[in-house]
């Protein structure tokens, strides 16, 4: 079974287009606040008109969980899988998958972006940085 596909809209298209080219982007407001996922207004000051910025691809592993139960049939053959909260070096946080090094995960470990693909869909996943190995 295929994984659920994201809904690509005019609002989030820059995010998906950037991933398709191998890098990650996030939105930043004139007030300085940065975030993911995409939205029309700043979650901090509610000002519209954010700009897109390219992320360095570096981040910090804040927390993670290991799923041993498939809550969607498409995940049944992937068990167990790791879902993590990563804070990008630029500030935004995102829920993502950790694709390797599971036995060496520790809080505050440095991680690097790895764009993975599920069929034609690019996904922002992360792996432990070489400095963490």
Can you say where each PLM-predicted feature lies in the sequence?
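OB-fold/S1-family single-stranded nucleic acid-binding modules
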Residues: 114-133
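Conserved hydrophobic positions within beta-strands
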Residues: 59-62, 98
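Short nucleic-acid-contacting surface segments enriched for D/E, G, S/T with interspersed K/R
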Residues: 100-112
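Short functional micro-motifs and their immediate structural scaffolds
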Residues: 36-37, 49-51
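Beta-strand/loop nucleic-acid-binding surfaces
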Residues: 92-102
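Cys/His-coordinated zinc-binding microdomains
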Residues: 30-33, 46
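Short, conserved beta-turn/loop elements at beta-strand boundaries and strand-helix junctions
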Residues: 64-69, 118-119
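The −1 position to Zn-ligating cysteines in a subset of zinc-ribbon hairpins
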Residues: 25-30, 41
